[in-house]
Amino acid sequence: MTIPDIASYFEIEPVEPGQLETPVPVIDLDIVERNIRRWQERCDALGLANRPHIKTHKLVGLARFQLAIGARGITVQKLGEAEAMADGGITDLLMTFNVVGAPKLRRFAALARRTGISVVADNPAVVEGLASAGREAGRKISVLVECDTGAKRNGVASPEAAAEPAG
């Protein structure tokens, strides 16, 4: 299968640099494509399922390209990012931040109806909310237990603590 070059995933209109209003992000698509391909080739060579995080680029076009060249799915941090990717037709999503609160759980349930989203959690209350959202969506939600690997930001701190949200 031949994968189109990265530019085919975007609608790009040439602009003279002097016409750009600053500040403006500018990327070299050739370099981006080379880096994404290099990383995917490395993952493939090691037998790793690549699930790139879109928190830096947040572009559906780049995510689609990453999937086209072999990424298993896309990782998102926030519900809005997941919704944007789903609106762009991407359905294999992993959300790496707890979903808490009734409004967000309703949005998560709506998203779960149209995607294969999975999510991480680090405590039983979050898992209970996700189970409720799954029932509302009419499907089981895959939940991974987040473990703190030393950054002391999120996640459970021990194997014993991991068993608690896993129920």
What label would you give each PLM region?
Residues M1-S8:
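N-terminal hydrophobic targeting/anchoring segments and the immediately downstream early-domain regions
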Residues P23, E33, Q40-R42, K104:
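Expand to "…catalyze enediolate/carbanion chemistry for C-C bond making/breaking, isomerization
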Residues D30-R38, E164:
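A non-catalytic, amphipathic alpha-helix used as a structural packing/dimerization or gating element
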Residues G18-E21, L29, W39, L46:
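N-terminal, Lys/Arg-enriched amphipathic/low-complexity engagement segments
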Residues I27-D30, S118:
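Short, surface-exposed alpha-helical recognition segments that flank or form part
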Residues S8-I27:
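Generic N-terminal amphipathic, Lys/Arg-enriched alpha-helix
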Residues H53-G167:
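Active-site-proximal beta-alpha core segment in soluble small-molecule metabolic enzymes
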